[in-house]
């Protein structure tokens, strides 16, 4: 189990009880905990309304237009869903799509 900080920015906080920062404890299936495990946890435990899952996910991964950072580094450079989380990591999701 790891404890990480998860941030929802750029308006994403609306589907997470209007709270931007969350401290979460996540368990992994085989001992280590990946960002994929974190995403599963978020969908199962943190999104209040099932209809809002499509705002966050598309084709079982983070929706295009949402910048995902692990400790301020683009998750694409860290292995995306395969990145193994450690205690104290900060994972942020920022919507880059805004109304005007």
From Swiss-Prot:
Its main location: cytoplasm. There is a cross-link at residue 100 (Glycyl lysine isopeptide (Gly-Lys) (interchain with K-? in acceptor proteins)). GO terms for molecular function: protein homodimerization activity; protein tag activity; sulfur carrier activity. C-terminal thiocarboxylation occurs in 2 steps, it is first acyl-adenylated (-COAMP) via the hesA/moeB/thiF part of UBA4, then thiocarboxylated (-COSH) via the rhodanese domain of UBA4. The keyword tRNA processing applies. It comes from the Eukaryota. Pfam families: Urm1. The modification 1-thioglycine is found at residue 100. PANTHER family: RURM1 PROTEIN (PTHR14986). Belongs to the URM1 family. This is Ubiquitin-related modifier 1. The gene is URM1.
């Amino acid at each position: 189990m790891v404890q990480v900080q998860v941030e929802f920015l750029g308006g994403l906080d609306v589907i997470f009880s209007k709270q931007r920062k969350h401290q979460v404890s996540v368990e992994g299936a085989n001992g280590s905990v990946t960002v994929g495990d974190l995403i599963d946890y978020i969908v199962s435990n943190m999104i209040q309304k099932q209809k809002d899952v499509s705002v966050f996910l598309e084709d079982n991964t983070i929706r295009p237009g949402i910048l995902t950072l692990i400790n301020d580094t683009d998750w694409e450079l860290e292995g995306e869903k395969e990145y193994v989380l450690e205690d104290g990591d900060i994972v942020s999701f920022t919507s880059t799509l805004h109304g005007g």
